[in-house]
């Protein structure tokens, strides 16, 4: 099995990998340039090493393909969606799928009769509203950068902030992308930590920035 970050609108469930699936994953590389190409390399390597073994692609975005248009469309020029696929996709789908099914089983409820809010909290963080076992909205968007504050990702901010900083500091789009994905989040607030255990320990010792990071993250999750 291969965890594939982006299945776009092509894949709404896990699939057996064949040549058409490989082409489909490759066609979505522009939506996940850091993840889909390496995923493909892994698939092709296993196909070469073990050609007789069936391979399955499990897509991080698939669970969220049940979101309604009102949840996944953005109020931006329609051409951006039609030509480039710009919309909310959501991520951590495999995690949210498992959690909702497991929670229903623990509560001894039919999954169709449940309403859950599922939280995936690690270095990446996402929140998903699930109705009847299906995703109806989620915090991550076009990329995993959107939503809650994360270890190194900023989460939701005013879209004008990157444009403002490009104007002020002369950053390239690649530099801004790196800053928002790799140098932001609780790392930026604390100045040194991404591990919440370290943050909790130092916060208990009175460090105001670790305390602030905890409070900001909790506030954003509740919001």
Q: Residue spans of the language-model regions?
A:
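Glycine-rich phosphate-binding loop of actin/hexokinase-like ATP-binding domains
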Residues: 65-168
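A gly/proline- and charged-residue-enriched helix-loop-helix capping module
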Residues: 24-42, 49, 83-86, 95-97
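Short beta-strand-loop/turn "lid" adjacent to the catalytic site in phosphate-handling enzymes
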Residues: 1-35, 54-56, 62-73
């Amino acid at each position: 099995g291969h965890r594939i970050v982006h299945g776009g609108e092509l894949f709404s469930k896990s699939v057996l990998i064949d040549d058409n699936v490989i082409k489909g994953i490759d066609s979505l590389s522009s939506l996940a340039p850091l993840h889909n190409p390496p995923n493909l390399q892994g698939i092709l390597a296993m196909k070469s090493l073990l050609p007789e073994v069936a391979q399955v692609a499990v897509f991080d975005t698939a669970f969220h393909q049940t979101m309604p248009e009102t949840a996944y469309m953005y109020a931006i020029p329609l051409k951006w969606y039609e030509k480039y696929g710009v919309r909310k996709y959501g991520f951590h789908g495999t995690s949210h799928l498992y959690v909702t099914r497991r929670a229903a089983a623990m509560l001894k409820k039919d999954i169709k009769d449940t309403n859950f809010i599922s939280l995936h909290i690690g270095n990446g963080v996402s929140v998903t509203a699930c109705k009847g076992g299906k995703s109806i909205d989620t915090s991550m968007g076009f990329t995993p950068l959107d939503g809650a504050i994360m270890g190194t990702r900023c989460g939701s901010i005013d879209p004008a902030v990157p444009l403002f900083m490009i104007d002020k500091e002369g950053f390239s789009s690649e530099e801004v992308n790196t800053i928002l994905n790799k140098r932001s989040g609780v790392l930026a607030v604390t100045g040194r930590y991404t591990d919440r255990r370290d943050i909790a320990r130092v916060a208990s010792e009175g460090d105001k920035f670790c305390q602030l990071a905890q409070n900001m993250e909790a506030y954003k999750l509740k919001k």
